[in-house]
Amino acid sequence: MEYARLGDSGLKVSKVILGCMGYGSPEWQGWVLNEEESLPLIEHAYNKGIRTWDTADMYSHGKSEEIVGKALKKYNIPRSRVVILTKCYFGVDDQGNFPSPLSTGRQNEGDYLNRVGLSRRHILEAVDASVERLGTYIDVLQIHRLDRETPREEIMRALNDVVESGKARYIGASSMAAWEFQTLQNIAIRNGWHKFISMQNYHNLIAREEEREMIPYCLDSGVSLIPWSPVARGALARPWASRSTLRENTDAGISILVRARESESDKAIIDRVEELADKKGISMAQVAIAWSLSHPSEYPIVGLNTKDRIDEAVASVQVKLTPEEIQYLEEPYVPKAIHPGER
C-alpha cells in the first residue's frame, strides 16, 4: 500500500480507503455484512496496509461505527496506526432498530426533530455519539451532506469547535455543489477557523460531472478527493449483463444512481473496462480503482466484502494505466444530469 497527504494537511492516508458502509447489520440493507463477518475483514485490510477507514453514524444506525471500534480492541490495533473518518448529518435510530436509509432519518421533523442536519446542537450531539461508539477520537469528521436550512456560519463554527475540543482532528465534506463548498471554506478562512481538507464526492468512470467544477476547485485550493463508489456500486466491477449479485438486488442506491440513468454510453464504458481488464489479466474493479488513482490527490473509498477483494484493491495501487488506456476508457462518456442523491 502507498500513502499520501490528505489535502493541505499533514495527515497521511492510504491511497485506497476502506469503506465501512458494508459492515453493520443486514437488517439495515440486505447486502451488509454482520459483525462476525466484518471484523476479520477489517483486520485483514489493516494487515495489508489499508490503514484508513471511512464510516458514518447513519451506516446501520451506528452499528458500523461500533464494529470499527471493536476491531481496534479485538485485534489490539494501536489507535495511532489508523486513520478513522466518519460523518454526521442524517438521523440515527435510537431504539435499536434498523429502518431503511430511504425511509427515515432524512427530514428534521417528528421523532427526528433536531436529530437531522447540521445545526450546532446536532453536530455536537452526533460527534459525542460517534466518539462513544468508536471508543476513540475521530481523525476526519465529514459533513455527510449540506444542511441548506442551517446558517452556514453556524455549521462552520460548530465544526471548528469540534476540532478545538479534540474530538476530531480535521474536517471534511461530502456531496454538494462546488459553489456551496467554496462558500463554507470562505467562511472558515474569513474567521480563521479550521478548513475542510477533503471532499467525498461521487466520481467514477460512468459519473464524471464533478470534473466540471468541484474537482478543479478542490485541486486549486488544496483539498483532496476521496470519492465514494469508485466502482459505481459494483456496476464497473462486473460485465454489463451481470446483475444477479446480492447487492444488485438489495441496494437501492444501485437502481437510483446507476440503473435509472444508465445509457449506451455506460454500456460502452463498462465493456471497455472488461476488455482492458482481460488484456491486463486483472479484475474490472482494479481497472476502475486504477482509473480513480490516476487523478492527482484522489484516493477512492472502496467497499470490500471478502479478503480476496481486499487483496485486489491493495494490488490496484500498482496498476498504472497509460494515457492511451485512460483516454480509451473515458472516450464514450456522455454527460449526465445530477441526481439529488449526489447533493
Swiss-Prot record:
GO molecular function: hydroxyversicolorone reductase activity; versiconal hemiacetal acetate reductase activity; versiconal reductase activity
Keywords from the UniProt entry: NADP, Oxidoreductase
UniProt catalytic activity: (2S)-versicolorone + NADP(+) = 1'-hydroxyversicolorone + NADPH + H(+); (3S)-versiconol acetate + NADP(+) = (2S,3S)-versiconal hemiacetal acetate + NADPH + H(+); (S)-versiconol + NADP(+) = (2S-3S)-versiconal hemiacetal + NADPH + H(+)
Residues given in the record as substrate binding sites: H144
Entry's EC annotation: 1.1.1.353
Top-level division of the source organism's lineage: Eukaryota
Residues of the site described as Lowers pKa of active site Tyr: K87
Coiled-coil stretches: none
The protein's enzyme class: oxidoreductase
Free-text disruption phenotype from the record: Aflatoxin production is not inhibited, while the enzyme activity catalyzing the reaction from versiconal hemiacetal acetate (VHA), to versiconol acetate (VOAc), which branches from the main pathway, significantly decreases.
Residues that, per the record, bind NADP(+): S229, P230, V231, A232, R233, G234, A235, L236, A237, R238, P239
Entry annotation: catalytic residues: Y59
Family: Belongs to the aldo/keto reductase family. Aldo/keto reductase 2 subfamily.
Function noted in UniProt: Catalyzes 3 reactions: from hydroxyversicolorone (HVN) to versicolorone (VONE), from versiconal hemiacetal acetate (VHA) to versiconol acetate (VOAc) and from versiconal (VHOH) to versiconol (VOH). Probably not an aflatoxin biosynthesis gene: may be involved in the vertical branching steps connecting the main pathway from HVN to VHOH with the side pathway from VONE to VOH.
Name the record gives this protein: Versiconal hemiacetal acetate reductase
